[in-house]
Amino acid sequence: MVMAVEDSVVRVVVRVRPPTPKELESQRRPVIQVVDERMLVFDPEECDGGFPGLKWSGSLSGPKKKGKDLTFVFDRVFSEVATQQDVFQHTTHNILDSFLQGYNCSVFAYGATGAGKTHTMLGREGDPGIMYLTTMELYRRLEACQEEKQFEVLISYLEVYNEQIYDLLEPKGPLTIREDPDKGVVVPGLSFHQPASAQQLLEMLTRGNCSRTQHPTDANATSSRSHAIFQIFVKQQDRVPGLTQALRVAKMSLIDLAGSERASSTHAKGERLREGANINRSLLALINVLNALADAKGRKSHVPYRDSKLTRLLKDSIGGNCRTVMIAAVSPSSLTYEDTYNTLKYADRAKEIRLTLKSNVISLDHHISQYATICQQLQAEVAALREKLQTYEAGAQALQQRSPQPPKLSIPQNLSSSPLQPGHSSQSCAPEFHAKYDAPQEESLGTDSQGQGTVEENAPEQEQPPQDKQFPTQMPEPNLPGSPCPTVQAKQGMNQHSLQRLDAEHSKQLALRVLRLAQRQYSLLQAANLLTPDMISEFETLQQLVLEESMEHGAESPRSPGLARGIPLAQELCSESKSSRYCGPVTRTMAKQLSGLTHTLGIPLAPDCTSDKTSQKPTKEKKRKLNLEEPGSLPAPSVEMKRQRQSFLPCLRRGSLPKIQPSSEPRTPKGERASSPSPSSRVCPATVIKSRVPLGPSALQNCSTPLTLPTRDLNTTFNVSEESPSKPSFPEPIDWEKVSPELNGTDQPFLPSAPVFIFTTKGRKPSLPTTTASKKRRTVRPSVSRGRSCIARLPSSTLKKPDRPFTVPDPPLSLHCLDDHQVIRD
């Protein structure tokens, strides 16, 4: 610790308080006469004769009485008319400069009871004392130097009552005193607080004053029965670090001592008498310390600090490394003649105390070997700050550039990539809502083939970078969707109507996407039995809005063929609902709940909701080829599950089962009801591969598939067909006696005990199953009855697509049908 040594003495000021109403009523002469700002006379002599109003005589003849006409000279004398601000300017205001330079400072008020010590230190509301004024001035100076230095302020407030130390900010039991060789006198358990502002510090000071012990006596109605010590600690350090960095630590103590009192004048008894005795004891120890320090005159001598806890706490404030100011408060009335005389005598004695001041500056200098490391750390910090500054400026500049531009709408890729005519200025482009939902998501739409063909033409262009999808503010008019080679010529004067039309089209597309998402979410929640009444009411409200929109539709969209023809959102949602299928495993509970599942949002099935089948078929095949090239189009791996009683069929991807024309064969009579709904008939190849036979005759155990929910067979691998999905329907059971001769003429055993999914396999030519295949399948049946599947997993590379598939109706069977048809065995 580096300290600047400086010699000083205790600064002593005297304040004479105004007379009280009781002293004025007694009509006693004052015993204090203030001569000037530094000198006063105690108990001046009266003239023997003369006018009654004349108090002093110019004649000094005759012997002097002991204690009469004594002249005292101090650093400052305040008369009865002095204000709190005057006392502050000549006491703590001057030592604040030394306090901020790292010197310890102390200000304490000493005097008899009722002399005005507490009023000088604390003041009252509207007329604050030294403690409040010092705090306000300290924070004002700290804020002035805040740009150059960083400060840390801590405060503590305690009292010494009956020779016991108590915390005023956090009241608890009595505390002890310890002496540390480095820190000096410390009080373990004393709370330290860090105020954020001067106002918060004043609130803490007020709260501590309310906890202080005060009791009225005959000498003073608001007598303080304890010594209060308010301490402020300040740490300051330069904000710009250097090789020679210093830390300054200083402490300021503002002390309000209790007044000495005489039992004969206060008439104290009991507890008040014991309090007065302890106060006088601690003040006597303080007087002995002052006398010892005054007699020492810089020499090392014994100072009785340990005679009282008060003197132990004030060890650093009185005779140690501290700049000290003593305020002696006296009364001008002759009723307190002895107390005033003793106060002036001890104050005059304190002037002889010499102090050795040392600035508490802690050097943080580093060794020369650490200079290189410090320089590297500082350079890294500067680089990090510069990078943050550049990032902040770049973000602010980008935000400023985007703010004046109007919002832009996304257009198809064939429009955004069209060249502009030469001579036309192209405006700045910004990335907006790109056409993220083009070909991959358009597969789920049930629109006509023309719209799907347009989507497929734009699908390869989506692999381009996102920058290619940006477009200028003045957008060219798009060509008709039916144009074979769409080209766009930029028009400099595009009217407002085109922009509004594009905006409306984009909004409608966005609404359609949201409704489809809500429809799928409703289906999944209903399948999992997670729907709540609130959610059902919200979906019903959405359904009502969709129905109202379907009656009021009339807007045309150049991008969507369905919207261009004026098709409402309800019908487009209808087409979407048919292509959405669930591809997860099916449990018994889900099969029962989904057996009666219909289209959500209350959208009925209509003939116009389906697109043309003949035109959709080649389009679907083309999309399938595109999706097979993508890695995401591969079938999901089967998840191993616990074996159940029913047999699981392979999970079919959306659109994997082919669709056929409705069969014209006669249906089962109405009296024979199916046990559960079943999908429509499928396209069947020449070779049929069946799954294992279920044990039970129940439709659910036979894996009867709900409307849109196929099941997953974990034991069989198939190469599914690549035809477009068929329209979900609820066909009635088919009379097996009237099945087409093609099916009845086969030699293969056919088990009508359960609905069987027909899959397309790859073979050399479309031929009927042979006897060898039938035998192979019959050898598998014993293993099925034991619950273990022995069907081999055929690699997809060995299966080939047949040249010409034919249709086989796949109806659901009831228990009645199972009795009529038995399993054919050899």
UniProtKB/Swiss-Prot annotation:
Its main location: nucleus. Residues 411-429, 444-455 have a biased composition (Polar residues). PROSITE patterns: KINESIN_MOTOR_1, KINESIN_MOTOR_2. It is found in: Nucleus; Cytoplasm; Cytoplasm, Cytoskeleton. Keywords: ATP-binding, Cell cycle, Cell division, Coiled coil, Cytoplasm, Cytoskeleton, Microtubule, Mitosis, Motor protein, Nucleotide-binding, Nucleus, Phosphoprotein. The modification Phosphoserine is found at S483, S633, S656, S814. CDD domains: KISc_KIP3_like (cd01370). One of its GO terms (cellular component) is nucleus. Belongs to the TRAFAC class myosin-kinesin ATPase superfamily. Kinesin family. In complex with KIF2C, constitutes the major microtubule plus-end depolymerizing activity in mitotic cells. Its major role may be to transport KIF2C and/or MAPRE1 along microtubules. This is Kinesin-like protein KIF18B. It comes from Rattus norvegicus. The gene is Kif18b.
